Design a protein with these regions (language model features):
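Alpha-helical scaffold elements lining the catalytic groove of polysaccharide deacetylases
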Residues: 99, 110-139, 150-197, 211-214
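Fungal secretory targeting signals
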Residues: 1-28
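A short acidic, amphipathic alpha-helical/loop segment
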Residues: 61-65, 93, 154-158, 214-218
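Short low-complexity, flexible loop/linker segments enriched in glycine and/or proline
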Residues: 89-92, 120-122, 181-185, 244-248
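Structural recognition of alpha->loop->beta junctions
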Residues: 97-102, 136-140, 162, 246-257
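C-terminal domain-boundary segment and adjacent tail
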Residues: 34-41, 69, 73, 81-83, ...
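Active-site-proximal beta-strand/loop segments in catalytic clefts of secreted hydrolases
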Residues: 50-54, 76-80, 108-110, 145-150, ...
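Active-site beta->alpha N-cap acidic-glycine motif
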Residues: 27-135, 139-141, 237
Length: 257
């Protein structure tokens, strides 16, 4: 009887252990390694032109300028900032960026300051836009950029749980803080004059002046200086841009903000 009782305890303990291994919990997600933070490119003579806050009207113009120059960019999309990502026109914009070979990534759902949110709230901001991008294009992004560039350990932990890296920058054209096209151009000129090995540039595709004046100017100046304009993933040494690549979904009633 004692042997049977001991055997029962062993079986129960083993079953409990296997159950715990088979069913990951939120706590297990929280204890994954924190996300890596990248603020500089690593591949020499590359520039990553990145664009936040879209999808919006001027994405097409930026994409056209890049493609015409044999260049690629990276677009960090929101879910519900300048319009809902599920709006038909925004769906087209996201698809266009991806289909043209640009990298697409997460800028969170509603452009909130993540450092003021709880673990669950940050997680919600991240997964909702990831879900939208996967539905629209079939890909799950491997990179995210926190709104305002604000992050803390909590944000790094949630991003790590989502298997994402955090992308920052080492150059800002200051279009989001009111810089005129002339001022943004001078900032690019000053950066190029220093002859850095690489540049990871922050721009915003929601500003007409950026799309029509600054970016065409920057592309020309950067290429004349010998830089290759590539995606973020490429400038980081050809890291995977996406966690997975699949087929897009068809729109249904769940596609709303």
């Amino acid at each position: 009887m004692q042997f049977i009782a001991k055997l029962s305890l062993i079986v129960a303990a083993t079953s409990s252990l296997l159950g715990a291994l088979a069913l990951p919990t939120d706590h297990m997600l929280e204890t994954r390694a924190a996300a890596k933070v990248y603020s500089k490119c690593t591949k020499p003579k590359t520039v990553a032109l990145t664009f936040d806050d879209g999808p919006w009207y001027y994405l097409y113009d930026i994409s056209k300028a890049l493609v015409a120059a044999g260049a690629k960019g990276t677009f960090f999309f929101n879910g519900d900032n300048y319009g809902c990502i599920y709006d038909p026109e925004n769906v087209k914009r996201v698809k266009h960026a991806y289909d043209k070979g640009h990298q697409i990534a997460s800028h969170t759902w509603a452009h909130k300051d993540l450092t003021k949110l709880s673990w669950d709230q940050v997680h919600d901001e991240m997964w909702r836009v990831e879900q939208a991008l996967q539905r629209i294009t079939g890909v799950v992004p491997a990179f995210m950029r926190p709104p305002f560039g604000n992050y803390n350990d909590n944000v790094k932990n949630v991003a790590g749980a989502r298997n994402q890296s955090i992308a920052m920058w080492d150059f800002d054209d200051e279009d989001s803080t009111g810089a005129t096209p002339a001022q943004s151009k001078k900032l690019y000129d000053a950066a190029i004059k220093k002859k850095p090995s690489t540049i990871l540039a922050l721009n915003h595709d929601v500003h007409e002046r950026t799309a029509h004046e600054v970016i065409p100017y920057a592309i020309e100046k950067l290429q004349k200086a010998g830089y290759k304009l590539v995606t973020l993933a490429e400038c980081l040494g050809d890291k995977p841009a996406y966690q997975s690549v699949g087929k897009p979904s068809k729109p249904d009633s769940s596609w709303h903000c």
